[in-house]
């Protein structure tokens, strides 16, 4: 845990349910260590329980179902190095349980639907990430999961997605513009793939963020199309395509990195890593090592895993620079 003299670094991880937040948080824990990182699920700040939302005719995505005043006050208190009595939302019962004491830590992650929604909370966040699954991929994933595992019909699944869509569009999706990085999961362009078994993943990196320099492929600021398949990277049809270049995203100047396709042999990932710069690694092959450490994590064999690890490494770099800055005495 931390003391009031330490710099608490606050990370925001935003996105809809089923977008990969849990896997990303596991990768962050691998980097920072469980003892140094506290994760707060912002569902705990629901002001209405499940029955209350049903009676009021609102979803959990609607700001009216959430207590942003309490969220702001408690996150501000944690960031100042003091403990809080955090409410608990019970996902099994749908009820609000008695609060629990939460101590500050070196890294505090707030994750959920709204970490970048409220301007007051957003101003407290040192680094913000938005995990963005395209509607086409989201539908395909949900169909595969819910039809196979839960026995839902195709019509039920589409109805569930469409019921959430207006609130998602109004309250969740706009947070992308405030994130320092966005990880987008999109349909492949390599072949026609109606089941989304192959993915095109983009890392959108905002320019001009304090202590954050976008990673790049080969030559910073250039536009690069690269097919790394060959003697040093094993690929089966339809292969892998990578892209890097400058762009504009929701009014922000950004650098894009993109991976379309699947990596066949993770041990060979070091070849790709070797051509990426400003990754935040501390030694040669660290990114590949982190991917190999948890081959079982979803997305490890495509751009999802690669960019989640890369963003985690960049967060570690931001953390180190923020804490170093806090230790420098102010000039008289």
Swiss-Prot record:
In its UniProt record, which GO terms are filed under biological process? reductive pentose-phosphate cycle
The record lists its disulfide bonds as none
For this record, the Gene Ontology CC terms, alphabetical, are: cytoplasm
**Top class in the EC scheme:** transferase
Acetylation as a keyword of this entry, yes or no, is no
Q: What is the effect of changing residue 222 to Y?
A: In a light-sensitive mutant with reduced activity
The biological pathway it contributes to is: Carbohydrate biosynthesis; Calvin cycle
GO molecular function term, any single one: ATP binding
Enzyme Commission (EC) number: 2.7.1.19
The answer, when asked if Nucleus is one of the entry's keywords, is no
Q: Which UniProt keywords apply?
A: ATP-binding, Calvin cycle, Kinase, Nucleotide-binding, Photosynthesis, Transferase
What up-regulates or down-regulates this gene?
Answer: By light.
What is this protein's record name? Phosphoribulokinase
Q: What is the lineage of its organism?
A: Bacteria, Bacillati, Cyanobacteriota, Cyanophyceae, Synechococcales
Q: Which gene encodes it?
A: prk
